[in-house]
Amino acid sequence: MKIDWAYLRKGWKSCQNAQAVLDEKHVGIKTTVDARKQRIDADAAWELLQSAASITTAKGKKVQTFNPESDAKADILKQAMGPTGNLRAPALRIKDSFVIGFNKELYEKDF
C-alpha cells in the first residue's frame, strides 16, 4: 500500500506513533507535507476533503467515518480541525479517502 499524501508534524507524538505503525507495515508515502511549515486552515482543508469518498477521524479511542456528500461540512470540520484552527496531523490521503488523527487499532486494521 502507498499513501498518496501525508500531513505530519515532526516531534508530535501522534505523528510519531502513526509513522511507527506505517514503517512497521512497510507503507510508503508519496508526498509529505510538514504541518509546522504549511498550515492548512478550514477553507483549505475543506478543499481537500470535499472530494473524498470517505473521511475517517480518530481522536483517542473515538473513531468516526464521514461521507462529504451526505454529512454536514461543519460536523466533518469539527473533527478534522485542531484547536488552533488548522487541519489536525497526522492526516493521510489514500486514493480517495482520508484518515485524520491517530488511533492504533484503526492503523493496525487499515494499513
PLM feature segments, named:
Residues 1-35:
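Local sequence-structure signature of Cys/Sec-based thiol-disulfide redox active-site neighborhoods
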Residues 37-111:
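Thiol/selenol-based redox catalytic cores and closely related redox-interacting motifs
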